[in-house]
Amino acid sequence: MLFGHEPHDLKPGQNVLVWGASGGLGSFAIQLINTAGANAIGVISDEDKRDFVMDLGAKGVINRKDFNCWGRLPEVGTDAYAEWFAEVRRFGKAIWDITGKGVNVDMVFEHPGEATFPVSTFGVTRGGMVVICAGTSGYNCTFDVRHMWSHQKRLQGSHFAHLKQAAAANKLMLDRRLDPCMSEVFPWEDLPVAHMKMLQNEHKPGNMAVLVQAPTTGLRTLDDVLEASRRR
């Protein structure tokens, strides 16, 4: 999402807004942004996630529960739209508190979709990019297209990575420059427990994993797997 969409490849010094910064996607995004020499602004939903995101290297954190501008865009020209617009501007000022007055984000790392898309498309800077890979809050994304054409913004879909990008990400992991932020690992028989935690939003910050034919955790290479299997 952050690389491969020329000319909007992430560059040192740029600012990126990351939705769901304490989750699986967001925690990786913040670390990748750091490796590129750019600045991550993480958005969280609970204050107890702030330290986790800051420890990942975010330049700043915003709690979305401090604002009321989520969901589908109200009809343009209505009182509801005016209220939404005022709240979005307040959210933008919270970003400026981190980036500096008048400095909007160059890129938005978007995956909630319906709940956040109107804010993403408004908040990204002139000539910037909103890149989206999912719609975890819904697929009916709305936005005020006037801000799109008048400020020449870009909407970009992203679906995983090509082989070279995947290999580069794996190398960062093997070199321990990326932390998988593995909060919980479940044996295969506890797969339903993991699913229920996701459904009820009870999972810890970071990522969960389930062992699939793996004898134990911490196996980084094929040789590690073979050695662990021989010990069983």
Where do the language-model regions lie?
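Adenosine-nucleotide cofactor-binding segment
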Residues: T35-A115
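Generic hydrophobic/aromatic pocket-lining and core-packing "Φ" positions
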Residues: I30, R50, F117-T121, V145
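Short, glycine/polar-rich helix-capping loops at beta-to-alpha or helix-loop-helix junctions
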Residues: S45-F52, Y139-V145, A166
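Helix-to-beta-strand junctions that scaffold the AdoMet/dcAdoMet cofactor pocket
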Residues: K11, V124-T125
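Short internal alpha-helix immediately C-terminal to a glycine-rich phosphate-binding loop
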Residues: M1-A36, A94
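Rossmann-fold dehydrogenase core element
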Residues: I62, R126-C133, F143-M182, A228-R231
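C-terminal hydrophobic helical "lid"/dimerization subdomain
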Residues: P118-T121, L163-R232
